[in-house]
């Protein structure tokens, strides 16, 4: 990603910190990019997926992500235990709160893929596949 907002961190008073890419160390910024996500994609990986999606840098395929949109601090208690307190939340560059919702893919995919007789995914060869993939459109934004 060249330049652009990566994430907003919003605290309970409504203060919004902006984290941006400066474009200085960009690698392959104009090459096609596809990101595969699922319900195991959480926290920092959700931030990355949301930033790439909202900045139109990548096409996101898969299932909605986990939805870990809160930032917590743990405070030590005198008995040795700790108390986790939510102190802020993440917003994507489009100001989407991902907590409990996740990043919604541009192109949904099923949780499992049909396979051919050799055990390989048959999605790209079968135009009627439930995968909803089209090889010619795979990298279009």
Where are the regions that the model predicts?
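C-terminal "post-core" interaction segments
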Residues: 1-141
